[in-house]
């Protein structure tokens, strides 16, 4: 609904207070990160990071693209991998590139669907901390979908609990944990 890939049954979709219900996905300035990395294997890390900035809908100079790639790759600690092909990276590095592709766009909202679930426990823990830090530093809205209670409780400022497609509870992690509205 937020990305515009489906229409709401009722109500409106507001992003930064603007009604986006009738806008196309491309007009919503939403970045998405999935569980699977979705990288272009024939491209380098730098080319993968630059790809969303080369859209006809975005007006960014080559100098700005290079600045954004440099800053983002340093933030994600993949700067030394910019010339590598995506196929030469570890799973954690590939996921960092996927996250970086979202970050370079500076969207109104980041949608992340289980971005850490396919990673090993150590890397998952490291990226959990890193994503929380990045979200705090950029101050953007990050909607993070997860089935992992640790991800939800340690990363969220607010949690929405869905059951059969319906929102059954919304609150702080502490409120949701201490006063669950459903125990099913």
Where are each of the predicted segments found?
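ABC ATPase nucleotide-binding domains
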Residues: 29, 39, 44-184
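Intrinsically disordered, low-complexity regions of eukaryotic proteins
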Residues: 8-11, 95
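ABC ATPase nucleotide-binding domain signature region
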Residues: 17, 25, 29-36
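Conserved ABC transporter NBD signature motif
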Residues: 11-18
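Helix-to-loop junction immediately C-terminal to a conserved catalytic motif
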Residues: 3
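A position-specific signal in ABC ATPase nucleotide-binding domains
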Residues: 6-7, 54
């Amino acid at each position: 609904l937020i990305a515009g890939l489906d229409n709401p049954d009722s109500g409106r979709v507001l992003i930064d207070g603007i009604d986006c219900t009738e806008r196309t996905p491309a007009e919503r300035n939403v970045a998405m990160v999935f569980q699977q990395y979705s990288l272009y294997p024939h491209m380098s890390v730098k080319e993968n990071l630059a790809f969303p900035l080369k859209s006809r809908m975005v007006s960014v100079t080559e100098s700005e693209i290079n600045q954004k790639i440099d800053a983002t790759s340093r933030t994600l600690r993949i700067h030394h991998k910019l010339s590598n092909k995506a196929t030469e990276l570890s799973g954690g590095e590939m996921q960092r590139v996927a996250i970086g592709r979202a970050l370079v766009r500076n969207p109104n909202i980041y949608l992340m669907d289980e971005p850490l679930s396919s990673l090993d426990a150590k890397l998952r823990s490291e990226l959990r901390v890193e994503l929380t830090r990045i979200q705090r530093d950029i101050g953007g809205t990050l909607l993070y979908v997860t089935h992992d209670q640790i991800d939800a409780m340690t990363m969220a400022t607010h949690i929405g609990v869905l059951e059969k497609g319906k929102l059954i509870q919304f609150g702080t992690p502490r409120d949701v944990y201490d006063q669950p509205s459903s125990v099913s």
